[in-house]
Design a protein with these regions (language model features):
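N-terminal accessory segments
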Residues: 1-186, 226-232, 375, 385-387, ...
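Conserved adenosyl
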Residues: 14-20, 24, 96, 105, ...
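Short acidic-aromatic active-site loops that bind/stabilize oxyanions
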Residues: 65, 203, 356-360
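Short, hinge-like loop/turn segments at secondary-structure boundaries
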Residues: 118, 279, 346-350
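C-terminal alpha-helical "lid/dimerization" subdomain adjacent to the S-adenosyl-L-methionine
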Residues: 327-374, 379
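Short beta-strand element of the conserved SAM-dependent methyltransferase core
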Residues: 392-396
């Protein structure tokens, strides 16, 4: 069976790849890298036979499965540490595993370039091998596979049972259906310490390799220039996890006056090792009144996408009560879904939010409705370079 595109179409796609690669090579901008990647993927899709494409999709879960097994077997760590050719028997010996099983895992890993093959049953580290020794990368694989995959497999059944309605409510979603629980993920996770640790570590690196908002958002112009140097608090990281984002802000602006406050649940704050001299820890519940009043910046990254519109209305209303009109800024770092030609990464995150939290990512119009309904006005949507999270700058009406 032939591909479904003509030679002329393939030539056009090849030209698009060449042009986008040229732009990336000359500018080295994130937006050009993403454009080149999309063009290359369109060419790959065009060359793929439709039936083969279906088979690749159907069998693709084996990729993540073998990566997850390889983490348990220390395959990535061993290849990286040896920094040279390693035989199949040597890799199997690390965990006293069956060489036949290890070879089956390695066939997939070599096929997706997560491991190199330099001779028959002899392997070597690649860039992706080394990446999978990074604690943040390991945690995202563990969390998505161990917590997300069992639920993902149940989503079609869950939706059939709910007449294919978009689910709502933090305790009545796919996770609750799959795990047979009646509590939110945030109540359930602390009962599973290993999964909770994977989640919290994953959240430290949830931007992936995409640039921090501090690198492209005009922080000094939009936030610091209007800050009152005599004000008690400069920035509150609302539900900020272990404090990695607040630490990045402090590293970039070490001399800014005012308190820097990290807020989260007590069991999360206990895991934080941030600079105790400048970063204060404040135990906090999103659904209770905001304890820090009149700060210049209230920063929320990947918080509101964890909750439904109804729950977010309650969260934002509590926050609004602590903000100073005309002075305080709400800075939301989240994906902003495009109305068309959207990037794949935010679309995949959107489904993960349903799987884990029974929530969603949002478009500009959706964000605007949500914020205005809680007493805010959107000042500006700031688009990121590439396909990462944007910044929503908002104030009280």
């Amino acid at each position: 069976m032939a591909t479904t595109v003509s030679d002329e179409s393939i030539d056009q796609l090849q030209n698009q790849v060449t042009e986008s690669l040229g732009a990336f090579r000359s500018q080295r901008e994130e937006i050009d890298r993403v454009a080149a990647l999309k063009a290359a993927q369109r060419l790959v899709n065009a060359l793929q036979k439709p039936q083969d494409s279906v088979y690749h999709l159907a069998y693709s879960p084996t990729h993540a499965m073998c990566v997850r097994i390889a983490i348990d077997m220390d395959i990535f760590a061993t290849l990286t540490e040896r920094n040279g050719p390693v035989s199949l028997d040597e890799l199997a010996a690390v965990k006293k595993a069956s060489p036949i099983l290890v070879e089956r895992v390695l066939r997939i890993l070599v096929g997706i370039d997560y491991v190199g093959e330099c001779d028959t049953r002899v392997y070597i580290a690649t860039t992706m091998t080394r990446q999978l020794t990074d604690r943040l990368s390991i945690s995202v694989i563990k969390f998505i596979f161990d917590v997300g995959m069992p639920t993902l497999a149940k989503v079609p059944e869950f939706l059939r049972g709910h007449d294919h309605r978009n689910p709502e409510g933090a305790t009545t979603g796919p996770l609750q259906f799959a795990e047979k629980i009646d509590e939110s993920i945030w109540t359930w996770l602390p009962q599973n310490p290993e999964k909770l640790d994977s989640c919290n570590t994953f959240m430290e690196g949830d931007r992936g390799a995409r640039p921090s908002w501090l690198e492209w958002f005009p922080v000094e112009e939009r936030l610091l220039c209007g800050a009152n140097p005599d004000a008690e608090t400069l920035m509150v990281d609302v539900a900020g996890g272990r404090g990695h984002d607040l630490a990045a802000f402090l590293a970039r602006y070490p001399d800014v006056p005012g308190r820097l406050v990290l807020e989260d649940l007590p069991h999360v704050l206990e895991e934080s090792t941030m600079d105790a001299e400048r970063i204060e820890k404040q135990a906090f519940d999103l659904f209770k009144p905001q304890p820090i009043h009149g700060a210049r910046i209230y920063y929320m990254k990947f918080i509101l996408h964890d909750w439904s519109d109804e729950e977010n209305h309650a969260i934002l209303t509590q926050l609004a009560g602590a903000m100073e009109q005309g002075y305080s800024k709400l800075i939301i770092e989240e994906f902003v879904l495009a109305d068309r030609d959207g990037a794949m990464l935010p679309a995949m995150w959107d489904w993960e939010m349903m799987i884990f939290c029974n929530s969603m990512e949002r478009s500009k119009s959706h964000w605007t409705r949500l914020l205005e309904g809680a007493g805010f006005q959107v000042i500006k949507f700031w688009a990121p370079p590439g396909d990462g999270q944007g910044i929503i700058e908002a104030e009280l009406k």
